[in-house]
């Protein structure tokens, strides 16, 4: 006799099945599906294929809604990023933004797709421009 499962949840699906599904999703849909639950987020990030061509980021004059434009397909995506409030982009490479807070001059790395933040130690030197080097690891 079959055992009836009460209140099944999408979070209970095997991660191998979620991996197959998410590996076929466009980046935008992968990000959306990754928001469902922690297990889906982990699988989504592991199979996420970031586009090989650069995207354009338009910074708002006010507020936290940033526009990302895929120049190859000319598609526009809007993303709320309160983490970047009052920040300036100093440099970008391989999906990472090197940011500086206007008010405190704190410097940090930010990945707009994963929303990972890496805070850097305070720098006592006065500087006008900064950059970073990162070899591309495959």
Curated annotation (Swiss-Prot):
InterPro entries: F-box-like_dom_sf, F-box_dom, KIB1-4_b-propeller. It holds the Pfam family F-box. It comes from the Eukaryota. Residues 7-53 form the F-box domain. This is F-box protein At4g12382. It comes from Arabidopsis thaliana.
């Amino acid at each position: 006799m079959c055992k009836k499962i009460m209140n099944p949840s999408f979070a209970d699906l095997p991660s191998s099945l979620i991996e197959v599904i998410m590996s076929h999703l466009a980046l935008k849909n992968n990000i959306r599906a990754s928001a469902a639950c922690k297990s889906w987020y982990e699988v989504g990030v592991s199979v996420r294929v970031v586009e090989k061509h650069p995207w354009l980021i338009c910074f708002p004059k006010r507020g936290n809604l940033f526009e990302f434009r895929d120049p190859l397909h000319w598609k526009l995506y809007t993303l709320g990023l309160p983490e970047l409030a009052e920040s300036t982009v100093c440099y970008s490479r391989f999906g990472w933004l090197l940011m500086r807070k206007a008010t405190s001059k704190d410097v940090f790395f930010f990945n707009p797709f994963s929303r990972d933040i890496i805070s850097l130690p305070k720098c006592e030197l006065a500087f006008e421009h900064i950059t970073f080097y990162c070899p591309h690891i495959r």
